[in-house]
A protein has these predicted regions:
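Short, Lys/Arg- and Gly-enriched loop/turn segments at beta-strand edges
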Residues: 73-84
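Short nucleic-acid-contacting surface segments enriched for D/E, G, S/T with interspersed K/R
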Residues: 54-67
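Domain-level recognition of nuclease-like catalytic cores that cleave nucleotide substrates
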Residues: 205-260
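Active-site metal-binding core of divalent-cation-utilizing nuclease and nuclease-like domains
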Residues: 95-102, 109, 113, 118-165, ...
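Flexible glycine-rich surface loops and low-complexity tracts that mediate binding to linear polymers
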Residues: 64-74, 240-241
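Short alpha-helix capping/helix-loop boundary micro-motifs
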Residues: 46-56
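Short aromatic-glycine-enriched beta-strand elements
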Residues: 32-37
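Nucleic-acid nuclease catalytic cores
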Residues: 168-183, 187-218, 240-242
Length: 260
């Protein structure tokens, strides 16, 4: 099956991932980067795994509502994982944000498979995750896409995903801290041009934003490299999603601003 065959142009609202409803609680504190204490509705306090190593600028609100996934396993120390946080949105109302950085690659893959990006990427035959590339093949690209025979552009597509949760007003920003890894990814994306296509996908894990820009305030060098990459031909596709207790749905592409 070709990914994205015969999908309608407007797919806004299409659920891409559906799961058992998450458990709601109140965030007490986040500490040691990977841990968060959350009080559940019955008053029980649980420690959840926080799969987000960054500062979580603008989305860390002790006393605010959060959603956790319960998945006990002998392989894992903690049975709970922090998935979503409720934050003040751009229009003054509350907005749910996806904070689990392990999710965006799955989400973008699901969007491609559903045909959400067919207009931008063309028809795709295969999607391979975590393929070695770059200098001395020491990096791994998030997704390597192969076009179908009918795709007018026959080049491979190197696609890098960035979980984006920070915003100012209605503009989503990445990064929210200095990221040498992110800088390196931009350089390596430029390196696959022009023989292959290079695509940067900011995964906008909140639905109150209408544009994306590099977070120059947090990492000026990233901003410089972002604009350099854009000028060199790296395609920027900010994908927006709505996060709910039992599903995540496609909200369409957002515009790109070279600067906020």
């Amino acid at each position: 099956r070709h990914h994205g065959a015969s999908q309608p142009a407007s797919m806004t609202g299409t659920p891409l991932l559906e799961f058992a409803p998450l458990t709601e609680g109140v965030l007490l504190k986040r500490y040691k980067r990977f841990l968060a204490d959350v009080e559940l509705a019955d008053g029980e306090v649980v420690t959840a795994h926080c799969a987000n190593t960054g500062p979580m600028t603008g989305v860390l609100h002790p006393g605010g509502r959060v959603r956790l996934r319960y998945a006990p396993s002998p392989k894992r120390k903690l049975a709970w994982t922090w998935e979503q946080a409720e934050v003040p949105g751009a229009d003054g109302s509350l907005c749910w944000v996806g904070v689990n950085t392990a999710l965006p690659n799955r989400l973008i893959r699901a969007a491609i498979e559903a045909g959400c990006l067919e207009e931008q990427l063309g028809a795709i035959s295969t999607i391979r995750p975590e393929v070695a590339y770059g200098e001395n093949r020491r990096s791994r690209i998030d997704l390597l896409l192969s076009p179908t025979e009918t795709n007018p552009d026959q080049r491979s597509i190197y696609l890098e995903v960035k979980n984006t949760t920070w915003s100012e007003g209605t503009t989503a920003l990445f990064p929210d801290t200095v990221t040498e890894r992110g800088q390196k990814h931009l350089v390596e994306l430029m390196g696959v041009l022009p023989g292959s296509r290079a695509v940067l996908v900011p995964c906008l894990s909140r639905d109150d934003v209408d544009a994306f820009a590099p977070g120059d305030e947090a990492d000026p060098r990233y901003g410089e490299l972002f604009r350099e990459a854009q000028a060199a031909g790296v395609e920027i596709l900010p994908c927006c999603f709505r996060f709910e207790a039992g599903r995540i749905s496609w909200q369409g592409l957002r515009g790109v601003k070279a600067r906020n």
